[in-house]
Amino acid sequence: MMSSRLVGTALCRQLSHVPVPQYLPALRPTADTASSLLHGCSAAAPAQRAGLWPPSWFSPPRHASTLSAPAQDGGKEKAAGTAGKVPPGEDGGAEKEAVVSYWAVPPSKVSKEDGSEWRWTCFRPWETYQADLSIDLHKHHVPTTILDKLALRTVKALRWPTDIFFQRRYACRAMMLETVAAVPGMVGGVLLHLKSLRRFEHSGGWIRALLEEAENERMHLMTFMEVAQPRWYERALVLAVQGVFFNAYFLGYLLSPKFAHRVVGYLEEEAIHSYTEFLKDIDSGAIQDCPAPAIALDYWRLPQGSTLRDVVTVVRADEAHHRDVNHFASDVHYQDLELKTTPAPLGYH
């Protein structure tokens, strides 16, 4: 302890005899320098040119915006994150730079085959298709096992309150149906995705197939939203039903994927029946056959002049495809196989 004190005392004595550099007095704050520091005046400019104030080790790096750079450089540089020009607005304003993003990622411009602008951002032209109307609408999987019978009775039990609530308001009924039908594909796709990551294995294309099914059902909902505007209590019902059904199906898929897919297969059979009744009411005049929404014309590549009846027809064909896919997936599990061993029907809406 004493030796440390002696060494410290000797070091202090040596430092006390070190001559002070001549430029240090220039660092003492005066009235002028204090004023320049407080008000941003140019009084410190001579000291800066002389290299005396501030020293390089004291001055922090400058983190200023680059937006003012064009004014200083005569407008030679453009601000980062801008691309393209915006045409003058309706108020006669001048052209403005279109701010894309901080990362300067420009949005892609998509056009139709005829060169007109593509109006939708929720889907692209290469995601559109023509529905296969030749599919058999009368297929029915006859339940043979206890799980099959339980799945069928579960779907029948879900249909009973729907019939009471909506009766023959099939536009609103279809809207409610699609909010439920879009859940299983997403749940199954997510669980298979996590399984693929967890086991370091491929899925056989089933992740994409189920997510495509969920997206297709969501597009059904977006279409019928243009036809039937839901009331506030119907929106509240959607929240309740979706919250319960999502968690129930999630748990059911974890416990038994073959049961979960069988439930969806029977649910799609009921959807086919509902859309068939929808078409009967359109043909009888009970429901007005209004023009098809624009989103339906582009998504299903329907010809101009198509009506609501054409939309319901292609949606019913989609449901028939979903019926076949889910019954097929359930059959794969019943044979004690995994979905990854059987190629998925990609693009099979």
Curated annotation (Swiss-Prot):
Cofactor(s) the record lists: Fe cation
InterPro entries: AOX, AOX_sf
Xref: Pfam families: AOX
Region Disordered: start-end pairs: 63-93
Amino-acid positions noted as binding Fe cation 2 in the UniProt annotation, renumbered to this chain: E217, E268, E319, H322
GO annotation, cellular component aspect: mitochondrial inner membrane
Record EC number: 1.10.3.11
A Gene Ontology BP annotation from the UniProt entry: alternative respiration
Keywords from the named record: Disulfide bond, Electron transport, Iron, Membrane, Metal-binding, Mitochondrion, Mitochondrion inner membrane, Oxidoreductase, Respiratory chain, Transit peptide, Transmembrane, Transmembrane helix, Transport
Subcellular location per the Swiss-Prot or TrEMBL entry: Mitochondrion inner membrane
Binding annotation for Fe cation 1: E178, E217, H220, E319
Family membership noted in the UniProt record: Belongs to the alternative oxidase family.
Protein name: Ubiquinol oxidase 1, mitochondrial
Organism: Sauromatum venosum
